[in-house]
Amino acid sequence: MAMTLIVLAATMGNKYGGLKQLEGIGPNGETILDFSVYDAVRVGFDKIVFVISRHFEQEFKKLVSGKYEHVVDVEYVYQDVETIPEEKRNPKRTALYGSVRAVLMGEELIDAPFGVINAVNFYQRESFELLYNNLVALKDAGYHSFNVCYRLKNVLAESGGVTRGICEVDENGYLISVTDRTGVERISSK
């Protein structure tokens, strides 16, 4: 059974002003995406589906394809406003339709449990281990999905507001609800 990781990489960071997912940050120019793919492959993922935009397809593939295709199966799907059926499309909308729509772009390539990450977020290896191990256990566990969550204080930007899904869980750790909050920011205790 292939263990697939869907990487959401179609958005261009408006606040950042460019393709944050392709910006080198490591000592040898590694991107956040490089660290994620490395950790995902090390824990057992053997297929990566990148959800990208046709607007930067060539640049993305040039920087990504050669790095990963020799160690993991790589496929691409596209998320653009044009992928919405015309009768359901808002003609005034230029922004992408969100993470769920992005994941649906890859549905024809998925035939087993899969994980989803954002290309611009840093996930520690332990997160990939938790994700992978729970995906392997899904069939026998009696549930169909799960969420790897983080404490809010650990996922806030140093400055400025962000949008976060706030998860409510019960005493057993089961998800009760997710509420989208915008403008969430760190407040100094000084």
Task: Please give the residue ranges for each predicted region.
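Short beta-strand-to-loop acidic/aromatic patch adjacent to the donor-nucleotide binding site
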Residues: 112-122
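Residue-level signal for inorganic ion chemistry
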Residues: 33, 106, 151
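Conserved core of the sugar-phosphate nucleotidyltransferase
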Residues: 125-190
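Structural beta-sheet core signal
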Residues: 5-7, 50, 116, 145-148
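N-terminal glycine-rich phosphate-binding loop and ensuing alpha1 helix
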Residues: 2-65, 72-74, 79, 91
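A short, conserved beta-strand element in the Rossmann-like catalytic core
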Residues: 13, 122-124
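Short, electropositive alpha-helical surface patch
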Residues: 59-71, 128-137
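Short phosphate-binding loop-to-helix
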Residues: 68-113
